[in-house]
Amino acid sequence: MAIVEIDSLDFPGVELFSSLTEKQLRHSYEKGNGVFIVESPKVIDRALIEGYEPLALLCEQRHVVGDAAEIISRCGDIPVYTGSRELLASLTGYVLTRGVLCAMRRPAELSVEEVCRDARRVVVIDGVVDATNVGAMFRSAAALGIDAVLMTRTSCDPLNRRAVRVSMGAVFSIPWTWIDCPVSDLNRYGFRTAAMALTDNSVSIDDAALLAEPRLAIVMGNEGDGLPAATIAAADYVVRIPMARGIDSLNVAAAAAVAFWQLR
């Protein structure tokens, strides 16, 4: 490894951590699969365990021989850019979580067939745009026995920096990919689909037939608008979570956790 002391915001080599947007990162780095940013030693550790390739580290000076020392030792021959807490916060636009960031190469995109081949329970995240919600849903999915996650392209990228951090690295341990036509694609692979929505014909989440399905895809919609009407109409089930005290809905990440637990 090479420890490189930076002394300015335009220091050569640090543009991955400063000037590139999330979209630019996805399409950067020699026309490969792109790059994403991971923060905190614990989450970087999860990524390394799952085989993700580190490209560069950005680390506060005090953490080089502290919290980040083990991570640095495991990342091989990559540059480790270091500077003061204040300089790095100015460079990135935020205070580094636990003082360290890692730029990593995005993996090759999996096919829907690869992700679903051995799965029994999957979730479709359809149009969920908030990174915190996506990260929380991945963490719940991994913890509560969901086998795979399928994302529509209107959803937030699961490898968004904040989504990765909120998931605590769960995005690295559960298979996921993008999907274009959730209901028809999943029906073709032998799944019945359960759209989480409030409609006149919705069934309770504890419905016996629903629970007995051998392969089930739970479809979660946008934070404000929910699922598209066409998706609801095409689903095999429309499912509601019974609630009390006149409450008719939950935050999408909270609703997803309830659904994952009940339908596992």
Set out the residue ranges of the language-model regions:
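Active-site/ligand-binding-proximal alpha/beta "capping" segment
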Residues: 195-247
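Short, aromatic/basic amphipathic alpha-helical patches
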Residues: 66-77, 230-231
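RNA substrate-binding interface of SAM-dependent RNA methyltransferases
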Residues: 49, 82, 105-201
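Glycine- and other small-residue-rich loops at beta-strand/loop junctions that grip anionic moieties
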Residues: 6, 36, 126-127, 152-153, ...
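Boundary-proximal intrinsically disordered activation/regulatory segments immediately upstream
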Residues: 1-67, 155-156
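Short acidic-hydrophobic, aromatic-tinged amphipathic segments that line or gate anion-handling sites
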Residues: 3-8, 79-84, 174-182, 239
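Glycine/small-residue-rich loop that forms an oxyanion/phosphate-binding "nest" at active or ligand-binding sites
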Residues: 72-97
